[in-house]
Amino acid sequence: ETYRYDFGFFKGSLLLDMDHQLLRLGVVDTAFALEPSDIKSFRILEDGEVLYEGEKGNFRSYKSDIRERLKELKPRIEEYKMLRHEYEIMAEMERNREQNGRDNDRDFRDRVTEPDFNVPNPVDKFAVEIILEHPYWKNFYKETGAPKFNSDHPSTIDYLDDYTQKTEELHTLAQNLMQLIDPQAQ
């Protein structure tokens, strides 16, 4: 095993053995071994849009619009942060009132509700698709999770860092798949 990409707990792995020129798909104990000649092409997708794709002699990568999507969400995130800050100030005032024995506003919690962070994540999922030229297998398709906002302290910067880490892992996977399909590829 030269390289492994895990799809998540109990979701299997994709293993590349460059020394023996094999690709193993599935759960490690029951993985199917395929040779480079069995692989026609591959695509790595972000919400159905191609990020990376390759076939013998041809590797392409595409730019994501993640920065634009995050920019669109920023006002909603800032609004949540403001509401959260106001809530925390009011909750602190209530705690101080209770500690000082001046609990004459018992319905405070009925009036002030903790804000919910319900901004959608910019990316729902990534997927790896491998098109095969094999008598028994035609393709391999497996989804993998995308980063999520921290619901208590959402940040576009933190999300972009997590997204960058994930796409770098997927880029490494794409490079390794390309190396297996076409060792001459750059």
Region annotations inferred by a language model:
Residues 1-22, 66, 73:
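Anionic N-terminal interaction surfaces
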